Amino acid sequence: MSAVMTPAGFTDYKVADITLAAWGRRELIIAESEMPALMGLRRKYAGQQPLKGAKILGCIHMTIQTGVLIETLVALGAEVRWSSCNIFSTQDQAAAAIAAAGIPVFAWKGETEEEYEWCIEQTILKDGQPWDANMVLDDGGDLTEILHKKYPQMLERIHGITEETTTGVHRLLDMLKNGTLKVPAINVNDSVTKSKNDNKYGCRHSLNDAIKRGTDHLLSGKQALVIGYGDVGKGSSQSLRQEGMIVKVAEVDPICAMQACMDGFEVVSPYKNGINDGTEASIDAALLGKIDLIVTTTGNVNVCDANMLKALKKRAVVCNIGHFDNEIDTAFMRKNWAWEEVKPQVHKIHRTGKDGFDAHNDDYLILLAEGRLVNLGNATGHPSRIMDGSFANQVLAQIHLFEQKYADLPAAEKAKRLSVEVLPKKLDEEVALEMVKGFGGVVTQLTPKQAEYIGVSVEGPFKPDTYRY
């Protein structure tokens, strides 16, 4: 590693290639111009230094946009140590730029599972000893789980966790229910300016981009099956429809299924009469035999299971835009079928057996990103303007929890404060306003009479917590 581009003597990092730092810095500067909410918070709070004294363990995709988030946290007074939450999602030039700025980061694209866990451990440890961290910023919950299982003593100093994604929120809620969560958390995922931007509009932008980069296929006129119609599924379905695909949706939630119908998508099930009894006989082979592309979007396990994979049309593309690779039964694929790497993060999965394959045989599936996040494995993820809302939420959530000083409270008070909550709506609206300003939009202010008539403050919040946007 070159020491030329980093502060003298700084070695507290591991990235693929530190010489990529200048490239990364150029991209960071462009990203800043596309992240008005995040940069607005940086300007607004720089003088107050609300995160002075905060020591943040971060585990989120090490992209260019994350670089802007990291430098915003630092600009507001925090110290950070960073790793990526996915083995394929790091942009190496982004990691290099952050390392060159003297910020500890441990991430590179194409980590093994062992290297991934090692990188997380390096953020937790400094000079071989647990760092005196007092905040956690997580995406997916792996960092949170490692802290609870291997370093529980560190939780005594930690004021809280901010969690970015659906999967991580599910894990936090399970921990809270089971009595194993030791510190409060903010569910950033369900902030409106996160879920409606990142999950929906971000996937609308980045899914088709990733599939086209990975396969060079024309998508129009082909049939796609999107598994799940939550916010991610909604954006994904729109993304494929934009390409001219014939999109079908599979859902378990009647409300989401109804929304898919109302949006003009045919709601189908890969199982006969919607019943999965675990046998091949329960599969709707006639349906799956016509599907050219299957996308999982749920955050649940085995929603594209082994029997579905057996029944899929030859040469169908299979990918996931949820969080972990267990949405698709990749374990079955590894155990029973031969894998042929076409290029990084693109594999032909030969269904003719495990021990070998005929390269000219056409009974294969094309698996993208090994079943992990396709938009970050095969492309660069959501654009900066989308991540602006998500990361502005993260900054405000970190400030909010850090100000609460949970770790300093008496035991009785801690018991009352232990929860998983969404960011207060007023802060959500603050993020939204900065985003609107970034588009050059002008928001109309209520008159006092109008505000009184609908029972809100002129300054907001403007909707009750029960309002569904």
UniProtKB/Swiss-Prot annotation:
NAD(+) binds at residues 165-167, 199, 228-233, 251, 300, 321-323, 375. Pfam families: AdoHcyase, AdoHcyase_NAD. Pathway: Amino-acid biosynthesis; L-homocysteine biosynthesis; L-homocysteine from S-adenosyl-L-homocysteine: step 1/1. One of its GO terms (cellular component) is cytosol. Its cofactor is NAD(+). Keywords: Cytoplasm, Hydrolase, NAD, One-carbon metabolism. It comes from the Bacteria. It is found in: Cytoplasm. Its EC number is 3.13.2.1. It catalyses: S-adenosyl-L-homocysteine + H2O = L-homocysteine + adenosine. InterPro entries: Adenosylhomocyst_ase-like_sf, Adenosylhomocysteinase-like, Ado_hCys_hydrolase_NAD-bd, NAD(P)-bd_dom_sf, S-Ado-L-homoCys_hydrolase_CS. Substrate binds at residues 63, 139, 164, 194, 198. SUPFAM superfamilies: Formate/glycerate dehydrogenase catalytic domain-like, NAD(P)-binding Rossmann-fold domains. The keyword rRNA processing does not apply. GO terms for biological process: L-homocysteine biosynthetic process; one-carbon metabolic process; S-adenosylmethionine cycle. May play a key role in the regulation of the intracellular concentration of adenosylhomocysteine. PANTHER family: ADENOSYLHOMOCYSTEINASE (PTHR23420:SF0). This is Adenosylhomocysteinase. It comes from Pseudomonas aeruginosa (strain ATCC 15692 / DSM 22644 / CIP 104116 / JCM 14847 / LMG 12228 / 1C / PRS 101 / PAO1). The gene is ahcY.
